[in-house]
Amino acid sequence: MHERKSASKKSGYAYLDAMFMQRHRKLFFKRAVRFAIIAFVLPVALGIFSKLTGKNLMADLIGPIGIWIFIIYVVAFKENYTKALFNNIDKYMLCYKWYRRPGAILSSYFIRLKSSFLMNGLITLPLIFGIVIGGMLSSVRIKSILLLVVMLVILTLFYSVHYLTMYYMLQPYTDQSKIKSPIYSISNTFIYAFSLVMMQIKSVPMWLYLLICAVVLIYMLVSFSMMKRLAPKTFKRKE
């Protein structure tokens, strides 16, 4: 009853998305809140410890930006979100032609993109606050803090956009929830491998930092354009 009341102010795809998110809040929001608490408390605690002991552990945490690429990869909502969308909504709705029209696809995509970013932001935002507070307590350079904050925002945008966009462009799931698209599997493997490699790099040079940010932003723009052209043809059920 509460679900219907809170979603009743919305209509169309926004209503459908609101009902989906409410009915699956245990799957999504409980996980996000759990990570959010850890993400905020841990850096603040390290900042306090660093200030009291003189051991600047926060500098060791903030400095190696590469490891954060892997951390955000681990905690972000990725396939668990798109698979839930397919199993609970799209597997049934894709039978209808009106649901696969370009306008309908774009509407549902941007509504879901907002939800994806909000869920990932629910983890990243407390982390950013925790890092800023912990960093200031332990006198970490402002430049180092800002570089990490920008990277965290970029990564949050990337993981929110990439998996949802690939889902719409490729729709990789069969009715049995198995992945049938080799391109989808290869792209996910590449991202995992890249994150793993970056974790080994203790100090990311500025040129690489800027390159990563630029590539992510360009990728998002290109993926939006490709999704608009391809999704009406590819966003369908697979046998």
Task: Please describe what each predicted stretch is.
Residues M1-C95, A104-E239:
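Hydrophobic alpha-helical transmembrane segments of membrane proteins
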